[in-house]
C-alpha cells in the first residue's frame, strides 16, 4: 500500500496518509515503525516533544528503504520559539534523526501568548533556503495567524496540520 501523493504549493509532495509516531519508543517503537515502512508508509510524523526522533531515525536506517523515498516530518516545540532557538532546535532534531535534511518542518503550536511564531517562521524560511528542510509549515494555526505569516514574510505555509481525533 503506497498512498497517493498531494502536491504542495512549494513544489514538493506528501503522501495522503502517514504514520504518526507519538508514543512509539524504544525497541518496540523501532519495530512498529519498520513494520509500517514495510507495509508501505512513506510519511513518518514525529516531533521534538514526542521524545522519539532517535527511534524514528533508527527505524529509517533499519527499514532498508532509501532515505530519499521517505518523508520525515518533525515539529518545533513551543519552548524553542524564536529565530535562533528555531535554528538550534532543527539542528538538534537532525542530529537525533541522523539525517541530512528534514522533509517537512512544522511549528507545533502557535503559542500566541508569547508571540514569537513569526520569528520562528523567518528562521524556518532560512532553513529551507539552506536546504536543511524541504518544506515548512505549521500546526493548529488559525486563518488570522496564517494571514499574519504571509503579511510579515510573504511566505505562506505549505501545510497547516490540524489535530483532530475522537479524544481531542
Each predicted region: which residue ranges?
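Alpha-helical scaffolding within the catalytic cores
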Residues: 1-6, 54-61, 89-92, 143-147, ...
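N-terminal binding-site loop/beta-alpha segment at the start of enzyme catalytic domains
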Residues: 1-70, 100
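Active-site beta-loop-alpha junctions enriched in small/polar residues
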Residues: 22-24, 47-49, 75-79, 107-110, ...
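Conserved, mostly hydrophobic/aromatic
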Residues: 19, 36, 44, 56, ...
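Glycine/small-residue-rich loop that forms an oxyanion/phosphate-binding "nest" at active or ligand-binding sites
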Residues: 77-126
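Short, acidic/polar
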Residues: 24-37, 82-97, 119, 144-148
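Beta/alpha (TIM)-barrel catalytic core signal, keyed to glycine-rich beta->alpha loops juxtaposed to Asp/Glu
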Residues: 110-168
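Conserved hydrophobic residues forming the short capping helix/wall of the S-adenosyl-L-methionine
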Residues: 60, 64, 94, 128, ...
Amino acid at each position: 500500500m503506497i498512498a497517493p501523493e498531494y502536491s504542495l504549493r512549494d513544489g514538493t509532495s506528501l503522501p495522503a496518509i502517514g504514520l504518526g509516531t507519538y508514543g512509539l519508543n524504544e525497541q518496540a517503537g523501532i519495530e512498529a515503525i519498520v513494520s509500517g515502512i514495510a507495509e508501505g508508509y512513506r510519511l513518518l510524523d514525529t516531533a521534538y516533544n514526542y521524545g522519539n526522533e532517535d527511534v524514528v531515525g533508527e527505524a529509517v536506517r533499519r527499514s532498508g528503504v532509501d532515505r530519499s523515498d521517505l518523508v520525515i516530518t518533525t515539529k518545533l516545540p513551543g519552548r524553542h520559539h524564536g529565530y535562533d532557538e528555531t535554528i538550534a532546535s532543527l539542528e538538534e532534531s537532525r542530529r537525533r534523526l541522523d539525517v541530512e535534511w528534514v522533509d517537512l518542518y512544522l511549528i507545533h503550536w502557535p503559542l500566541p501568548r508569547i508571540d514569537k511564531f513569526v520569528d520562528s517562521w523567518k528562521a524556518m524560511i532560512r532553513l529551507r533556503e539552506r536546504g536543511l528542510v524541504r518544506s515548512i509549515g505549521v500546526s493548529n494555526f488559525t486563518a488570522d495567524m496564517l494571514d499574519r505569516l504571509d503579511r510579515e514574510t510573504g511566505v505562506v505555509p505549505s501545510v497547516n496540520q490540524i489535530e483532530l481525533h475522537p479524544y481531542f
